[in-house]
Design a protein with these regions (language model features):
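Residues at alpha-helix caps and immediate loop-helix transition turns in enzyme cores, especially N-
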Residues: 25-26, 87, 115-118
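A short, acidic, amphipathic alpha-helical segment used as a generic capping/interface helix at domain edges
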Residues: 83-96
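A short, acidic, flexible beta-alpha connecting loop/helix-capping segment that sits on the rim
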Residues: 104-115
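Acidic/histidine-rich catalytic cores of soluble enzymes
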Residues: 1-79
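C-terminal helical cap(s) of enzyme catalytic domains, especially alpha/beta-barrels
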Residues: 113-135
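Alpha-helix N-cap and loop-to-helix initiation/capping positions
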Residues: 2, 76-83, 114-121
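Short, well-ordered coil/turn segments that N-cap beta-strands
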Residues: 7-11, 36-38, 97-102, 131, ...
């Protein structure tokens, strides 16, 4: 807010995933900064299942705790646009109304899936959402 107040000509990019992970509603956040947004990262995520080792978690050993924390931390997974928890049509609409010019599909990890397959899934979902004219 300080930068925006002192540099009104400065535009910036927003990342839908990290806005939401930071505890904010991406649609409201985008609307708040309407007019300053030029680029929106369309990044979705899903909550996976946490694997529980057979026999339970060993909280008494450092190795057991580290394994638990790794599983706990990695329960949030990046997802193809439209395959996760975020309301992508509403995010895109807010971005368009707020002056967004560029919308980038971004997925930090494909978890073994070919990145081009992930990109195709995101593309197909964007088309289904009504944004086929972007391609």
């Amino acid at each position: 807010d300080i930068i925006r107040a002192n540099a009104p000509a400065l535009g910036f990019e927003l990342d839908s995933h990290w806005i939401h992970r930071g505890g904010q509603d991406p649609v409201k956040f985008i609307k708040k900064y309407a007019g300053s947004i030029r680029l929106v990262h369309l990044k979705d995520y899903r909550i996976g299942e946490m694997p529980i080792p057979e026999g339970g978690v060993d909280f008494t050993s450092k190795e057991g705790m580290m394994k638990f924390m790794s599983n706990f931390t990695n329960i949030v997974q990046f997802a193809e646009v439209g395959e996760g928890t975020l309301d992508m049509p509403a995010i895109i609409q807010a971005g368009l109304e707020g002056g967004g010019e560029y919308f980038l599909v971004e997925q930090d990890d494909c978890y073994g899936r070919d990145p081009f397959d992930s990109l195709k899934i995101s593309h197909d979902n964007l088309v289904k959402m009504g944004f086929g004219d972007w391609f």
